C-alpha cells in the first residue's frame, strides 16, 4: 500500500526589504484606486448632459499626448486589435469634436491634418496580428476595413480634399459592398476563419455615408445582414449574437455585452426600430448597478461567463469594461439620457 506523501509546510521568509516593497505597492494601488473612485462618484446620479468644453478639451489633449508617446501600442496587451482601435476611436473623436464646433475653422484644420496622419499610420496595420490572417477577398478583415473606411468618411465630411483618401474611400466602399454581397452568411470574417456579425456595423455605416456623399446604392448590403441577424437572435436573450459559424445557421457564441454595446452605438443609422427594440431589451437584461448611482454592463448574460473564443478586455464581477465604456455611446445614440 502506497503511503501518502505530505508536503512540508511552506516556508515564508520576511525581510525588511520585502515589507517596504509590499507597503509601497499597496500605497500605489490605493492612490490609483482612490482617484478612479472619486472620478466615478463625481458622476453618480447624473443624467445625460453635454459635457463642459473644458472637460472635453482636457480629456482630448490627454489622449493625444498618450497616443503620440506610443501608449496605443500597450493596448495590444489587453486585446489583439487594441492598438488599431485606440487610433481609430481617437480619429472618431477628432471628427465628432470638429462637427460639434462648426464655426471653429482652426480646430477643423488641425483635425484634418491629424486625420491624414492617422490614416497613413493605421493603413499598414492590415499586415499585423490579428488582421493579417484574414481572407484575401477582404484584406485585414471587416473590423480593419470597416473602421478605416468610416474614418475616411469622417475626413471627407469635414471637408478634407486629399485625393488619395477620397479615392481610397471609393475603392474601400466598393470592396466592402462586394464582400457583404458575396459572403454567405452575409458578413465577411473579422479574423482568419472567425466571424462576428456585429463587427460589420461600422463597415455598413461607412457604406451608408458613401451613399449620402456620392449618391451610390451600397446600403443595399444592409438588407441581407439585417435579415440574417433578425432571424438568428440568441434564443436565451432574444438579442443579437456575437459569433457565427462558417455555415449559415450555426451560432458559436450568443449575446455578449461588448458586442451589443459596439453594434448598438451605430445600429440606429441602419435600422432605427430594430435598434430601439434591441437596446430596450439589452438595458433591461444587462445593465447592473455597482455603486451609488453607477451603472455597468455585464459581459455575459446574468454575469455568468461562458466558454468563448475571444476575450473583451477586463471583466470584474461580471461587468465588462469594454461593454460599459462602449455602452455610453450606445445609450447616447439610442436616446437614453438616464
Predicted features, each with a name:
Residues 3-29:
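N-terminal Sec-pathway targeting helices
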Residues 26-89, 93-96, 112-128, 163-174, ...:
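Low-complexity, Ser/Thr/Pro/Gly-enriched N-terminal "stalk/linker" regions
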Residues 38-43, 88-106, 147-162, 202-215, ...:
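Well-ordered alpha-helical scaffold segments within catalytic/enzyme domains
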Residues 45-66, 103-125, 160-179, 215-232, ...:
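Extended, well-ordered alpha-helical scaffold segments
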Residues 68-76, 123-134, 181-189, 236-250, ...:
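Acidic/His metal-coordination segments adjacent to aromatic residues that form catalytic metal sites
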Residues 79-82, 86-88, 92-201:
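Extended ligand-binding groove/face enriched in aromatic
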Residues 143, 164, 183, 194-322, ...:
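Extended ligand-binding clefts on enzyme/binding-domain cores
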Residues 172-175, 190, 206-209, 225, ...:
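Short, hydrophobic/aromatic alpha-helical segments in well-folded domains
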Amino acid at each position: 500500500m502506497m503511503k501518502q506523501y505530505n508536503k512540508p509546510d511552506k516556508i515564508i521568509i520576511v525581510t525588511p526589504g520585502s515589507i517596504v516593497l509590499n507597503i509601497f505597492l499597496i500605497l500605489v494601488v490605493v492612490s490609483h484606486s482612490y482617484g478612479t473612485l472619486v472620478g466615478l462618484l463625481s458622476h453618480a446620479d447624473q443624467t445625460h448632459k453635454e459635457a463642459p468644453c473644458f472637460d472635453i478639451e482636457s480629456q482630448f489633449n490627454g489622449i493625444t499626448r498618450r497616443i503620440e508617446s506610443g501608449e496605443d501600442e500597450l493596448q495590444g496587451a489587453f486585446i489583439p486589435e487594441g492598438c488599431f482601435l485606440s487610433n481609430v476611436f481617437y480619429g472618431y473623436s477628432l471628427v465628432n469634436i470638429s462637427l460639434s464646433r462648426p464655426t471653429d475653422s482652426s480646430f477643423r484644420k488641425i483635425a484634418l491634418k491629424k486625420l491624414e496622419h492617422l490614416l497613413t499610420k493605421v493603413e499598414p496595420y492590415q499586415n499585423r496580428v490579428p488582421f493579417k490572417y484574414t481572407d484575401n477577398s477582404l484584406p485585414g478583415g471587416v473590423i480593419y476595413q470597416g473602421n478605416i473606411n468610416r474614418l475616411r468618411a469622417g475626413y471627407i465630411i469635414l471637408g478634407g480634399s486629399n485625393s488619395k483618401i477620397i479615392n481610397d474611400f471609393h475603392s474601400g466602399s466598393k470592396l466592402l459592398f462586394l464582400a457583404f454581397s458575396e459572403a454567405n452568411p452575409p458578413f465577411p470574417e473579422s479574423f482568419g476563419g472567425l466571424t462576428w456579425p456585429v463587427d460589420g456595423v461600422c463597415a455598413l455605416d461607412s457604406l451608408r455615408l458613401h451613399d449620402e456623399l456620392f449618391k451610390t446604392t451600397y446600403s443595399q448590403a444592409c438588407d441581407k445582414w439585417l435579415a440574417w441577424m433578425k432571424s438568428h437572435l440568441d434564443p436565451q436573450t432574444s438579442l443579437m449574437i456575437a459569433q457565427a459559424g462558417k455555415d449559415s445557421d450555426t451560432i458559436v457564441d450568443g449575446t455578449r455585452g461588448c458586442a451589443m454595446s459596439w453594434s448598438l452605438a451605430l445600429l440606429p443609422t441602419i435600422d432605427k426600430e430594430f435598434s430601439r427594440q434591441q437596446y430596450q431589451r439589452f438595458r433591461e437584461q444587462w445593465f447592473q448597478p455597482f455603486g451609488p448611482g453607477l451603472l455597468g454592463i455585464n459581459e455575459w448574460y446574468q454575469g455568468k461567463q461562458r466558454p468563448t473564443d475571444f476575450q473583451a478586455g477586463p471583466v470584474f464581477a461580471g461587468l465588462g469594461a469594454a461593454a460599459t465604456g462602449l455602452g455610453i455611446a450606445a445609450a447616447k445614440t439610442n436616446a437614453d439620457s438616464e
